[in-house]
Every structure is written in C-alpha cells, then in structure tokens.
Design a protein with these regions (language model features):
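A late-sequence structural motif
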Residues: 75, 228-282
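Central regulatory/effector-binding core of bacterial HTH transcription factors
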Residues: 60-122, 194, 301
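Short beta-strand-centered segments that line the small-molecule binding cleft or hinge
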Residues: 36, 40-43, 55, 78-82, ...
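Alpha-helical linker/hinge and terminal dimerization helices associated
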Residues: 12-13, 34-56, 269
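Hydrophobic/proline-rich hinge and linker segments of small-molecule sensing/allosteric domains
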Residues: 126-169, 238-250, 264-267
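Residues within the DNA-recognition helix of helix-turn-helix
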Residues: 4-5, 79
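Beta-alpha-beta core module
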Residues: 122-129, 133, 198-248
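A short LG(V/I)-centered, amphipathic sequence patch enriched
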Residues: 8-27
Length: 303
C-alpha cells in the first residue's frame, strides 16, 4: 500500500523520491526535500490544532499564571486547588513578582495570564479591573500579647512621621502609593526599599519601619498579635488589581473565567476586615480606563 502511494507521488511530481536497489531503498534528493517539507506541514497542523484547542473552555493542557505575592497569599491556594480539580492532567505554574517583571513575562509569552496592580503608567491593551482593596499601615505589635484591633484607623497626614519600608520604584504598589501621596501633597519617609515581599515583612517585624499593604494578606499574623493594622483614612488609599492576558500565546477562555470566579469566591477574604458596604468602590460599574479617577473621588466622599 505504501509503495503504491509513493509511486503515485513520483508519477504526479515527475521525479523519483526513492532510489531502489537489491539491498533496499534510499531517498533521493527530492525525497529528502519532500520529507522536510512534510515535517514542517505536520508541525504547522499540530500547532493550529493546539491553538484552536486552547479556545475550548473545557481543555487546559498547561497554564502559567503570575501575581504579586500579597495577592497569591490569598488567591493561590484555592485557585491552584480548583484548577487541579478541573484539569487533572494540566501542567500548572505560578509566579510571584513585581509589576514590571510580571508584565515583561506576560509580553514575552512566559505567562498566559497575570494579575497586576493597576498602577499609573502601566501599559497593556487588555487590562480588566477585578478587585479593589483598601491599604493599611502595617506595623510590628509593641507586645506579642496585644489584642488585635482590626477597627483602628490612621489619617493620611499622620503617615508623614512614620518610617516606611516599601518596594522599589518599579513595583506597582510603590507607584500606587507615590501617586496617591503626590495627589494629596504627602511627604512619606521611605526608610528603605525591599522588592522581596518576605524581606519587607522581616523589616517590619524588626520594628525598624512600617509598610502599606492590604490587611487581608496578613490576616493570620494580625489576629495572632504579630502585626497590627490601621486603615488609612482622610483620604483612603486603595490598590486595584487588574487581570491581563498574554497577546503572544494562546489563552484559554475557561482559565480566565475560573480566575474571575475564584476572585469572586474569596472576595470577602480580600476585603478583610470588612468595610461598610457603602465605602467599597463598585468595581463592576467602573471602566478600567476611568478607575483611578473614580477611586480618587471615592476617597473624598467616603472619608
């Protein structure tokens, strides 16, 4: 059967593809060239199949997802569990990092999806705001036995005299804080910079400096009396988390949907300690392009 097909090809192409002798067959130059072209065509077909298959929400062979460390502290465990349950054979990879690194990996195709701080100057064509969190002043507790006062507040003007440890200037959280401080004519004292989330918290625990983070990412430490938190008011300071998909590699629609659903599922965890409902910006009603200005307005109205 195979020999007949090869002879039909030779007849159609008008060139021998195999040199036949008593010891067997050897490919001619034309045969070698046809083999190379055929392999290229097969790879292209397989690539096309994979790209189309990625469009099915029920199929996921691999996923690389990036997010800031303070987001992964809340989202990663339930998200990883949900993805593993839904896609038992999928290769799952998670990456912590700052905005700049996550965005570079996203643009390079190393990540399928990333959760980013919607910071000033961030450039990506398909950012979608999915969550807004109020930031707190996070400090080491004077005594380990001190009861957690999760309702404590601090006015923005009082931050001026407090030494802070913050991420470097290329980090999205730092850009959000700097933009907020500039808008409100606040002069913050940055004692040192730490791009590593764990290193930043080590500085805080030493008592050398405080930091600005969502209380939710440190819930266990706050309730145990290791850290204390004070909600920043007059005006409030929010960070917005946005979802962005890669433009250079296929993105499974079902993956994006699952991430959004999981954020909704753990929304209360992200917003701990709960703020009154009327103080929480309605993310669903705000377009990404106008989100920052809307939050600025909310700062003045709420506090």
């Amino acid at each position: 059967m195979l020999s007949r097909h090869i002879r039909e090809l030779e007849t159609e192409l008008r060139v021998p593809l195999l040199y036949r002798n008593g010891r067997g067959v050897v490919m001619t130059q034309a045969g070698e060239r046809l083999k190379q072209l055929g392999a290229t065509i097969i790879r292209q077909i397989q690539d096309a199949q994979n790209q189309i298959r990625h469009l099915s929400p029920d199929y996921l062979d691999s996923a690389s997802i990036g997010m800031p460390a303070s987001v992964s502290a809340i989202l990663l465990p339930p998200l990883a569990r949900a993805l593993r349950n839904a896609h038992a054979d999928a290769e799952l990879r998670f990456l912590d990092g700052c905005n700049g690194d996550l965005l570079n990996n996203l643009n390079a195709g190393s990540l399928n999806v990333a959760l980013l701080y919607d910071a000033p100057g961030i450039a990506h064509p398909n950012l979608e705001a999915v969550l807004s969190q109020p930031l707190y002043l996070i400090e080491a507790c004077p005594t380990a036995s001190e009861a957690a006062d999760i309702g404590a507040t601090i006015e923005a003007a009082e931050l001026a005299g407090i030494p802070l440890v913050l991420p470097g200037k290329r980090h999205g959280l730092r850009q959000i804080v700097a933009s907020w401080a500039n808008r409100n004519a606040l002069d913050l004292t940055v004692q040192c910079e730490c791009d590593s989330y764990s290193s930043m918290l080590q500085v805080v625990s030493s008592g050398m400096a405080a930091t600005l983070l969502p209380a939710a990412s440190l819930k266990r430490e706050i309730l145990s009396g290791y850290f204390r938190c004070r909600l920043i008011t007059k005006p409030a300071l929010y960070r917005t988390i946005a979802l962005a998909a890669s433009q250079s590699r296929p993105v499974n629609a079902g993956l994006v949907t699952q991430i959004k659903k999981m954020i909704e599922t753990v929304r209360d965890d992200f917003l701990w300690p709960q703020l009154p409902a009327n103080t929480q910006p309605n993310i669903r009603a705000i377009q990404t392009s106008s989100l920052n200005s809307a939050l600025q307005t909310a700062e003045e109205i709420v506090f």
